[in-house]
Amino acid sequence: MITVVFCFSDCHGGIQILGRMSSVNKIKLNENNKMHSFGNWERCRNLGEGGFGLVIHWRNRTTGREIATKHIKEMGALSADQQVKLSERWNKELNWSRQFKNFPHIVAGVDIEDPDFLEYLNGMFSAKLPVIVLEYCNGGDVRKRLQSPENANGLTEFEVRQILGALRKALHFLHSQCGICHRDLKPDNIVIQRGVDGKKIYKLTDFGLARGTPDQTMVQSVVGTRHYYAPEVVENGFYNSTVDLWSFGVIAYELVTGELPFIPHQTLKNIILNLIKKPAKCIAITEDPEDNTRFVNQFELPQTHHLSRPWAAQFTKWLASPLNSNYKERGQLAANNVPVVFADLDKILNMNVLTIFAVNNCERLEYAVSAEMTMKDLIALIVLDTGMDEKELYFVLPTSHPHKTITPKSTPLQLYVEEWSDTSKDSRKWTKRSNPPVMLYIFQVKKECDYKIPEPILSILSRKFIANKFKTKERWLQKRVVLDMLYVLTKEQARYEMLVSGINERALSLEDEMMENSFIDSIDKQRIIISFAYDQLTSLLKEAQAKIPSRQLISSAQWEKLNRNYNFIIQSAKSIRSFLEACLREAKDMVKTTNQLRKEVCEKDLFDCARFYKKYLCNGAIISPSELNNDAEEFAKSRFKLYNEGEARHLPKSIDHMHYLYFKTKESIPVLLQQFCDIKKEIFQINLQMLMSASSTPPPKLELSAAMDRLAISSGSPSSDPFDSLRTINAIEEAERINNILVNEMKIDHY
């Protein structure tokens, strides 16, 4: 069997070498590694190397185009029969690569419009098999993604979905359109093409072991990497394209958990024996750490994953289908002639999961949302899960949310933002975009808010390890307890980041609300109008009484009541206005403080995860029960200090207090505006009363001064000049003018 790896990647520059090589081959390898070019084509580096094959990365200096070329170096060490088989397989792969040109999820062959360069490529080695020219994928492979520190316990749900969706399409295309069974599916053979926007496209590659798949089963040699091939391959050698479905299931489990599902550290014999007899719904097999002769069938995912609860539940049900040991059941077709494995996967890939962070409970919530779901349905679920009163719930959308604001007509599906499911550090780095950790924040709004911080829980395995319950300290057990502890550390880091982000978003939301709501402008406008009308009425009444002392236009009690009401409402308006201004200043200060806190927290390794990962997973240090216990205690101390002495303790309460007072002040504004309306009516009635009294009085022979003619009123900045004379007809006109202003102003909308 000849294995050539071509995971075309700029990441992790090491060369992967498979197969045994003689000293002669090693010398040739060193010679071939010398970087040289041909024309405009620069040879960048070797991507993959085997005993017979080589994959090279090239870049065109003029156009910037990048390609990968796959070669057979020499076949002299093979028998004539082996050379024929290799040639047949090679030419099939060459032809297949040309079939993939228009399919986005398979690495395709490409054309080179440079016959001299193509001739050079074909003449590089003694083997006369034609070069295979392929598109170059610049983002590494999925194996490298699984090996990154943030993915030690599996990938994020977003990336899992993206990879499974791409692999499902690639396999269905190969099986149904090309009649090809890949036979060597594994994370190493799923490569990544990263676009200029940083987004990733996943592509299946390496068809060195692929063969045509007739409808009937066929006897084949055992190929593929042992942890990914189906039990029937080893059991009897009879298999068909359903072996790819099994490998698909193994990859799916590994993507989610970071581990292989079926006792990978055990002997091949133990693995196969347990696979053959496992129940249909079993999705993993583990070794009992207290009895290494006992193996346990698992029907649920381990808790150390990064999936949302609703999606994890559906994923677990689906996973039993591709991991069914019975290949006939595994390959069942749905009504549309698509394998049930693919049809059921399509359903869960279409699930929309709304992510929420309940700040008062310091808890992440996740709900599957659909077009039929209402906000009432969502609120009922939140109340059930948090124990908060529905009337006390306050929703805050992240600043950049496309829905902008929640209205009575909003639906939960409108709050879902698909791209925000991608919260990985890798995406943040390449897309230059930092998605919020959730799609919605919820808070409790009342005078004294309740706060609860859930306690992190060490796995049972870790607790038993610390208590020295295990006689054996095998490497797999060491690694598992380290991964369990790392999961606790990373989850707590993520929880604290969500808490701080929520506090920051609430401060931003309050500031925006205060700036957008024109309460101060409304109060100022009404205060100016009322003050003007009151001053006009006072001047008019004073002059009228001076000119007609014998006639009392209004009673003293009526005037005192008006004066008392006027002074009260003006003072109330000033107080409310002053408080609103103070709230806005405080909100701006809170925004500055929480912006800085959020930046610091997101850039800091709060619980020293990197050191822990490097020491025990990169450098392979052996962890003892006492060391694990010490790490757990240090984590507990750091966590206690953060939640009880850090800014995240007092900031929420300060914002709570400000929000509650602002909320109560908002409730008083409609009352204030109604009081403005009421006093307008009072002034209107007094003006009307004066008008009627003046109309019944014989007009005195007095002339209005020029100041009366200059009286001007506007809704923007009303003004008037005092007058020193009064005639009945002018008194009526003046009263009517004031009345008209008040009538018009009483028609304004109130909050």
From Swiss-Prot:
ATP binds at residues 47-55, 70. Its EC number is 2.7.11.10. Residues 489-510 are annotated as: Leucine-zipper. The modification Phosphothreonine is found at residue 225. Its main location: cytoplasm. InterPro entries: IKK, Kinase-like_dom_sf, Prot_kinase_dom, Ser/Thr_kinase_AS. PROSITE patterns: PROTEIN_KINASE_DOM, PROTEIN_KINASE_ST. It comes from the Eukaryota. It is found in: Cytoplasm. This is Inhibitor of nuclear factor kappa-B kinase subunit beta. Keywords: Antiviral defense, ATP-binding, Cytoplasm, Immunity, Innate immunity, Kinase, Nucleotide-binding, Phosphoprotein, Serine/threonine-protein kinase, Transferase. Residues 41-341 form the Protein kinase domain. The active site is at 184 (proton acceptor). The modification Phosphoserine is found at residue 221. Required for the activation of the NF-kappa-B factor Relish (Rel) by acting as an essential signaling component in transmitting the lipopolysaccharide (LPS) signal leading to cact degradation, which is required for direct activation of Rel. Phosphorylates inhibitors of NF-kappa-B (cact) thus leading to the dissociation of the inhibitor/NF-kappa-B complex and ultimately the degradation of the NF-kappa-B inhibitor. Essential for antibacterial immune response. Also required for antiviral immune response. One of its GO terms (biological process) is peptidoglycan recognition protein signaling pathway. It comes from Drosophila melanogaster (Fruit fly). The gene is IKKbeta. Autophosphorylated; upon LPS stimulation it is transiently activated, and can be autophosphorylated. One of its GO terms (cellular component) is cytosol. The lineage of its organism: Eukaryota, Metazoa, Ecdysozoa, Arthropoda, Hexapoda. Interacts with key to form the I-kappa-B kinase complex. In vitro, interacts with cact. The keyword Cell wall biogenesis/degradation does not apply.
